[in-house]
């Protein structure tokens, strides 16, 4: 049936940033850092690395730098995070050399600064960060943060 009048467009807004608890010990999280949940203690975040079974948590929106002596138990400190699955498009550094043909490809945690294509990473399960939506240069792209289909 064709529209004969304007209709109300209903949408859900993207998730808002949220505070996540940080692992214990010496931690320096920079603004823009990719964060993973700690593998052995889900619920606490740390700077991301490409390790099997780690789960991407989001991108840090604030800096946190604490010494081990001041951070003796998990959850003492929190950091503001743009969460996994937020739907936002974020300009990201890509470890691999990419081309416009990579638009639509998934990218995964490479480290706290970069994402990578599946061929260059170990963790292609929980490490999914998002989908390349726009090629910018050989090592830079707009990436849409998406929820992992199995999480």
Language-model regions: role of each:
Residues 1-151:
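Surface-exposed, low-hydrophobicity beta-strand/loop segments enriched in small/polar/acidic residues
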